[in-house]
Amino acid sequence: MYKGIIKFVKRETLHEEFVINIGIFNRPSTAERFRKMLQEANVGYDVLLILERI
């Protein structure tokens, strides 16, 4: 199982704007699909996924 965290980094300044705990996932690919969806909806940001194995 994996604990997922999403970070929004503003592209222009590379400043971290938001950090969101997205919960627990059985597979990393599920969290990656969620990250990709957020990235497509927020073009001014780089959306980073951090996974921690628990």
Positions of predicted regions on the chain:
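Short intrinsically disordered terminal tails
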Residues: 1, 15, 52-54
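A short beta-strand micro-motif
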Residues: 2-10
